Design a protein with these regions (language model features):
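Short low-complexity stretches enriched in small and charged residues
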Residues: 17-26, 89-92, 153, 210-211, ...
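Short glycine/proline- and acidic residue-enriched helix-loop micro-motifs
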Residues: 36-39, 98-108, 162-170
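Active-site loop segments of alpha/beta catalytic cores
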Residues: 112-260
Length: 260
């Protein structure tokens, strides 16, 4: 059993440290590859390069775990919503169309993400068996924020939009849970042995919406992972004093503590 998996399952007395962006933004070997691959989505779909980037920090620092090089927005991409990464601005998604979203199907979704699973397979074969391979997804709420353009600023959300579209949002969240579980299942089959769920924009939610839009969706994903006997780490960034409530309700194997 790999080190991090043993810590999460057997509750070893060990304080784990997560190196955010293990490769991205600072390793010169990564920056060289990135400079030659301007289209970020295509880079994530290049199985060989994705594996190579994943292993770069392991070769430098001999960390306990590798984190597959990918992005949470590969899911909207696979659901046929155009995703661009603009230099110095970050991700930009085309306007959300509910009817188009609802026409998606699982077969096409998996087909578009096959290069991601291939990258996991390649990496697992190259990675020391004592080291974990962590895959990840964005939580439903966080993906939805990007997909419907719900952010009005870096630290605020368009509450009028959220309140106006609550029925639509609930429908989209439920669909996203299903697609995310499918994505996780395929990552596990490919060789991932730990899953991380990033709820990067959980902190934007008002208190009254945390249960419906954060706790419940995360709980369903955690339950799915546990049925697969795969430990899961959650990161509901920005929920502050609600971390204890999240932990008690969602019951992940591990919890990233917010750094704000």
């Amino acid at each position: 059993m790999s080190n991090i998996k043993e810590v999460l399952i057997n509750k070893k007395n060990c304080k784990s440290v997560w190196f955010m962006r293990q490769a991205g933004r600072y390793l010169p070997e990564f920056r060289e590859i990135r400079s030659q691959n301007q289209d970020f989505i295509n880079l994530c779909l290049n199985s060989e390069l994705s594996s190579k980037i994943t292993l770069q920090p392991i070769k430098r620092f001999n960390l306990d775990s590798a984190i597959i090089f990918s992005d949470i927005l590969m899911v909207p991409y696979a659901l046929n919503q155009k995703v661009d990464f603009l230099k110095n601005l970050g991700p930009k998604l085309e306007n959300f169309n509910l009817n188009k979203f609802l026409k998606n199907n699982e077969i096409d979704f998996v087909e578009k993400l096959k290069p991601v699973y291939k990258a996991i397979e390649i990496t697992r074969k190259r990675l020391n068996k004592e080291k974990s391979l962590i895959s990840f997804v964005g939580a439903p709420w966080t993906l939805l924020v990007y997909m419907i353009g719900a952010k009005s600023s870096k630290k605020e959300i368009d509450l009028k939009l959220i309140n106006r579209k609550k029925d639509e949002i609930s429908l989209v969240l439920e669909k996203l849970i299903n697609y995310l579980c499918l994505h996780i299942d395929n990552q596990i089959r490919a060789g991932a042995d730990v899953v991380q769920v990033f709820d990067s924009w959980a902190g934007l939610l008002p208190q009254e919406d945390l249960n419906s839009f954060c706790y419940t969706p995360n709980s369903k994903i955690v339950e799915f992972c546990k049925k697969k006997d795969i430990p899961v780490i959650c990161f509901p960034r920005g929920i502050k004093e609600n971390y204890k409530v999240f932990n008690n309700l969602v019951k992940p194997n591990g919890l990233n503590i917010d750094y704000n």
